[in-house]
């Protein structure tokens, strides 16, 4: 079956099981060709940065599907940040799609499309747009991050091109991107004191 949020050939895959208390995320980092704009997007099943997930884990209710989020950070002149957490009722995953509330990720066999329909924080500005990641090549490398192999990382597309088109805020650019995934079978803080 799928591992590390990927198929055996390295392509993103969104239907991988996630252990209670665990996590799985897909991470995109991009910089515009002009160097003036950037973005980071993280799609979480079991948001490791969520105080609500941590609290649920402490109460013995660590269902990662009740703590899904699309974290979007836009850098440059039109900065925005989103991190709305959504429950199992507001998400859907299959091999090619991960729907988180009104937003979604979709792998079409060639590129990853991220439809962003979120609201910013702390100011509730709309954040609406589309990001397309076109991998230069796919990697099937899968690396354990701790001595027991409970936490793993894999670069999906270390070198990729990106197209960014947002209506809110008004942004259009192209640039270089990086795509990877991380997964864990237990809470991240059990193996790590800090995360860079």
Stretches found by the model and what they are:
Residues 1-196:
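Targeting-peptide/extracellular-domain and disordered-appendage signature
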